[in-house]
């Protein structure tokens, strides 16, 4: 069907005060509420990184949340998005925290 929305995949990295503030847990909750799949994890350089996949409008909602909202006690300085592309099918069945 041509009415089906295209699926998008995007990688992200969030900079600021995003570790030790429950950022990953809130990201997982928000992703499940919005209805996207992928993953999130802390990096050794103090950022949070991951990947989001889903219908384009839902991925855009998650990108906005990762750029502006975050967890209640986080401070997002900037969020970089990369490798944004259209995919034919989702590569994950849910959204998870990686360690």
Curated annotation (Swiss-Prot):
N-acetylserine sites (modified residues): 2
Annotated Gene3D superfamilies: 3.30.70.100
Modified sites of kind Phosphoserine: 93
A molecular function (GO) term: identical protein binding
Family: Belongs to the acylphosphatase family.
PANTHER family reported in the protein's UniProt record: ACYLPHOSPHATASE, ACYLPHOSPHATASE-2
Protein function: Its physiological role is not yet clear.
Name of the molecule in the record: Acylphosphatase-2
Organism (species): Homo sapiens (Human)
Lineage, opening ranks: Eukaryota, Metazoa, Chordata, Craniata, Vertebrata
